[in-house]
A protein has these predicted regions:
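Cell-envelope and extracellular/periplasmic
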Residues: 19-304
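Bacterial Sec-dependent N-terminal signal peptides
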Residues: 1-20
Length: 304
């Protein structure tokens, strides 16, 4: 009886958190997290292959996409050694898909906000030798299940989704993983992919098959790009915790054990990262904190 009650409570918690994700976007169909700021970042195309150009691939759902308004401080002090490759055209700034720019936010799409990738990159260049440049490529879709990035399931995921979700996917020609892979291959012509950052899970909250699905996608990415897992770790950020007001915190117990399923995957704690009232997303300060934590873990793995 007690077990049945516990299972029912778990099911209801998972169901409610998934509903929270859909409800957020249904209520916020036109989001703009950098109103009035049309800063593209200086164009910074690498002249040729450089082994000291370290590249990181970033993917996931809305917290990787960036769901907090970019604040004045976030436009300041960005090193010319921290670059972003545009994953889509950004008409408001003139950024072009596949081109490199100084990493002025937004790093994902034209109207997205601050992401973990922002302060990941800033912290990396602050702690690496001056000879090393860091580049990020961010392809993320708000509301996405991890299955969106499984190309055997992408079409069905999109077909069975709400119109707002289809609109996000259309920015990537309905093939977000394919877009990320195409950009990654282009990036390999000028630098070395050193790691992959994932922040995803609200839509899949509590699903025990999630690690194996992540592993499938991670393995496919490595194989297609000719990379070895021991050289390219997967960093997986926790969701907003229960203590910090999150509604999808059940998934953190799964993320925290990701290393048991994928030996080269490492969880990134979100404890103490402030959250927004929607219970799904971090505040700008929360993104700054967790972004730094991604970097701190990567620096440890690089032995810096």
């Amino acid at each position: 009886m007690v077990r049945s009650i516990m299972l029912l409570a778990l099911f209801l918690a998972i169901k409610v958190s998934a509903q929270e994700v859909g409800s957020f976007y249904e209520k916020n169909t036109a989001l703009n997290f950098n109103d009035g700021r049309n800063i593209a970042g200086e164009i910074a195309q690498p002249s040729g292959f450089n082994p000291n150009f370290h590249i990181y691939l970033c993917f996931g759902q809305s917290n990787m996409e960036g769901n907090a308004k970019v604040e004045e401080q976030d436009f300041m002090g960005i090193s010319p050694r921290f670059l972003m490759m545009a994953g889509v055209d950004m008409p408001n700034t003139g950024r072009k898909e596949g081109k490199w720019y100084i990493a002025v936010p937004p790093l994902c799409r034209a109207w997205t906000g601050l992401t973990p990738a922002d302060y990941f990159g800033r912290t990396m260049v602050d702690n690496l030798p001056d000879t090393i440049t860091v580049g990020v490529i961010n392809v993320a879709v708000g509301g996405a299940s991890i299955d969106l990035y499984d190309e055997d399931k992408t079409d069905s995921v999109i077909a069975n989704s709400a119109d707002w979700f289809k609109g996000f996917c259309k920015d990537y020609d309905n093939q977000p993983l394919r877009r990320l892979m195409e950009l990654a291959k282009k990036a390999q012509q000028v630098g070395v992919i050193k790691g992959i950052l994932l922040h995803q899970g609200c839509t899949d909250n509590g699903q025990k098959t999630w690690p194996s699905r992540v592993n499938l996608i991670y393995t496919r990415m490595l194989n297609e790009l000719g990379l070895k897992a021991e050289d390219v770790p997967l960093l997986v950020g926790e969701l907003l915790t229960k203590v910090d007001g999150g509604c999808c915190y059940l998934h953190n117990s799964i993320i925290d054990n990701i290393h048991d399923y994928i030996p080269t995957a490492y969880p990134i704690s979100s404890l103490g990262c402030p959250g927004k009232p929607d219970k799904l997303h971090f505040t700008a300060e929360g993104y700054r904190i967790i972004g730094k934590r991604y970097a701190e873990r990567m620096l440890q793995l690089l032995k810096y």
